[in-house]
């Protein structure tokens, strides 16, 4: 709802109130001759003055009742949540009790924790890509892909962030996982982590709709999500892509996934890497190159993909992670098998309400692969950053209140301004008078000596005029703030990033108007490529929190941990080392040790980027 529509509603209300007396008299005089049309018109007018009725009555009011434990877990025999009741309640923007949400999340996490890093799934199955908090499109996805009771599903991650219904997606998918633990599989995406959910919208959404404890429970559950799936022993299904440190499928099985994804390394690559833009038509022979679009991980080439497939006896790699105009993309075929070496699936239609893209799911059955596309579904509107309508309307209310006050004060004439001063005004007058020095008569030749007021009435007039001027200035300031607030919200709504264009605030109102002229309906985003280009900044890994500095500004403290012992379970690393900032590749100690070292900034940077990249950029699979 814009301020324009709000003002028009207020105008209608005021006009109705002004004519209410005349309407009543007309109604009493011509009650017998009143036509049905006039009666319906009066009834329609009166609707605008009823504060308990919704202006847009075709949008149902969200339910205030939160589903209880007995309403969600309504079958004591199965002990499983009623996902149908959850779906219907979430479609109405309803919520559930926090204890119910915690139970769903923890029970789902317990099931995910028991699964391996790479799970085995069999056809027939429906493979789905990114969801990104678009719950109403997730419901449409199940309509297209088939009911979960009779259809196997594999989701490739990115269930949260960017959209405003992320927690509904998590609770609904987790309830399906509890109900169908063997036929519905969930993988981890790059957004299922603390770093991105704090930077984007999921944490804020959890706090607004529930509490921070729900967010913490979700983060623990995300740490349990598997990293990959092997479909029919033919297709490797992951969220991102290949890694220069992963040569075989066994390398995935030995990773420690129960943690926050690091900023580099094989786990990061599985979640963040992308194929080259010119995949299949590369001009270099490098298998991996730095991913400048994401700001982390790598681009992998067609040659790297084909060699990985050949070494692991696979047919293709199925991944998500990148928005696609058609909802999917088939890359260059493998020359050996004649099958696409890489397939990307994206299941969030009209991504961010700006991309205008289709969504797709991949159905694999009887050795036949079908792509089913679908369009977006209507969903309720949320103001940016979950702003409520009262916060949004404060600039408008402030402007109108000060405008009313100025109009009231301007009604007084000059004679009324000096009539009957109150105690506060008298006190202010005394302060004005005592400012005149006592020896003013002895310094008549001193030009700097202030003169006494000509009269009490003139001083009263001047004081009140100054107050009116101050309120008038305040009114103009509120008006400017309200206009700029509307411009900022409009700009955020026109950009896929939800952020203002660079420099939009630097020049004040003029720069905001110029930015709006560049993003008006006449020059709106015309293509998928244009939207993707504007959103590129949000596809990068956000900057991480700065490391703790030591006493010397030229060094930082880092902790390295080396381990040569075998892992406690099949998901931990064996004979590998995990580091917070630097990599320990010596493995000289036979016991677990923690070493504190001081290194320069350049050393840390080279250890985390240059050295790692140089070791694997052109390295082929053994």
UniProtKB/Swiss-Prot annotation:
GO MF, one example: calmodulin binding
Gene3D superfamilies: 3.60.21.10
Organism annotation: Drosophila melanogaster (Fruit fly)
Textual note on the cofactor: Binds 1 Fe(3+) ion per subunit. Binds 1 zinc ion per subunit.
Enzyme Commission number: 3.1.3.16
One annotated Gene Ontology cellular component of this protein: synaptic vesicle
Taxonomic lineage from the root: Eukaryota, Metazoa, Ecdysozoa, Arthropoda, Hexapoda
Spans annotated as Disordered: 1-74, 545-606
Name this protein carries in UniProt: Serine/threonine-protein phosphatase 2B catalytic subunit 1
GO biological process: calcineurin-mediated signaling; medium-term memory; mitophagy; negative regulation of epidermal growth factor receptor signaling pathway; regulation of innate immune response; response to Gram-negative bacterium; response to nitric oxide; sleep
Record-linked PANTHER family: SERINE/THREONINE-PROTEIN PHOSPHATASE 2B CATALYTIC SUBUNIT 1-RELATED
Cofactor(s) essential for the protein: Fe(3+); Zn(2+)
PTM annotation (Phosphoserine): residues: 527, 567
UniProt keyword terms in alphabetical order: Calmodulin-binding, Hydrolase, Iron, Metal-binding, Nitration, Phosphoprotein, Protein phosphatase, Zinc
């Amino acid at each position: 709802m814009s301020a324009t529509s709000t003002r028009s509603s207020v105008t209608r209300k005021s006009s109705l109130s002004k004519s209410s007396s005349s309407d009543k008299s007309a109604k009493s005089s011509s009650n017998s001759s009143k036509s049905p049309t006039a009666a319906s018109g009066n009834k329609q007018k009166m609707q605008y003055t009823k504060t308990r009725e919704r202006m847009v009555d075709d949008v149902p009011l969200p339910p205030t009742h939160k589903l209880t434990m007995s309403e969600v877990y309504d079958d004591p025999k199965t002990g499983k949540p009623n996902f149908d009741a959850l779906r219907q309640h979430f479609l109405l923007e309803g919520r559930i009790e926090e204890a119910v949400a915690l139970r769903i999340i923890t029970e789902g996490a317990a099931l995910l924790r028991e699964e391996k890093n790479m799970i085995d799934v069999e056809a027939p199955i429906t493979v789905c890509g990114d969801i990104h908090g678009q719950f109403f499109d997730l419901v449409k996805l199940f309509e297209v892909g088939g009911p979960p009771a009779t259809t196997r599903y594999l989701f490739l991650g990115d269930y949260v962030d960017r959209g405003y219904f992320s927690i509904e997606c998590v609770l609904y998918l987790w309830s399906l996982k509890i109900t169908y633990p063997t036929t519905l599989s969930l993988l981890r995406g790059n957004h299922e982590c603390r770093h991105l959910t704090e930077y984007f919208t999921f944490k804020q959404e959890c706090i607004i709709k529930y509490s921070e404890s729900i967010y913490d429970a979700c983060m623990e559950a995300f740490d349990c999500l598997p990293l990959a799936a092997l479909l029919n022993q033919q297709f490797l299904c992951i969220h991102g892509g290949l890694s220069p440190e992963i040569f075989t499928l066994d390398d995935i099985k030995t990773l420690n996934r129960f943690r926050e994804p690091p900023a580099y390394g094989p786990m990061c690559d599985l979640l963040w890497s992308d194929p080259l833009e010119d995949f299949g038509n590369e001009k270099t022979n490098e298998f991996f190159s730095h991913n400048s679009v994401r700001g982390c991980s790598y681009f992998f080439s067609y040659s790297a993909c084909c060699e990985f497939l050949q070494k692991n006896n696979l047919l293709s790699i199925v991944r998500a992670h990148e928005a696609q105009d058609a909802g999917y993309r088939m890359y260059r075929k493998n020359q050996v098998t004649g099958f696409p070496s890489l397939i990307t699936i994206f299941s969030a239609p009209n991504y961010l309400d700006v991309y205008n893209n289709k969504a797709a799911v991949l159905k694999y059955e009887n050795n036949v692969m079908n792509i089913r596309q679908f369009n977006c579904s209507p969903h309720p509107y949320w103001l940016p950053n979950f702003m409520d309508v009262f916060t949004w309307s404060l600039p408008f209310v402030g402007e109108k209140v000060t405008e009313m006050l100025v109009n009231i004060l301007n009604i007084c004439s000059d004679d009324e301004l000096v009539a009957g001063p109150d105690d506060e005004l008298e006190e202010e007058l005394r302060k004005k008078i005592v400012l005149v020095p006592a020896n003013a008569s002895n310094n008549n030749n001193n030009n700097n000596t202030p003169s006494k007021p000509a009269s009490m009435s003139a001083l009263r007039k001047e004081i009140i005029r100054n107050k009116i001027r101050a309120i008038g200035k305040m009114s103009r300031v509120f008006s400017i703030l309200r206009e700029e607030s509307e411009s900022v919200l409009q700009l955020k709504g026109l950009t896929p990033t939800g952020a203002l264009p660079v420099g939009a605030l630097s020049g004040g109102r003029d720069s905001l108007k110029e930015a709006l002229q560049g993003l008006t309906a006449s020059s709106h985003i015309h293509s998928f490529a244009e939207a993707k280009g504007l959103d590129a900044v949000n596809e990068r890994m956000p900057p991480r929190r700065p490391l703790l500095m030591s006493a010397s500004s030229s060094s930082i403290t880092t902790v390295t941990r080396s381990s040569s012992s075998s892992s406690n379970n099949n998901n931990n690393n064996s004979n590998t080392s995990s580091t917070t900032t630097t990599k320990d590749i010596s493995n000289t100690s036979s016991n677990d040790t923690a070493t504190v070292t001081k290194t320069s900034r350049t050393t840390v940077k080279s250890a985390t980027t240059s050295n790692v990249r140089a070791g694997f950029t052109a390295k082929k699979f053994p």
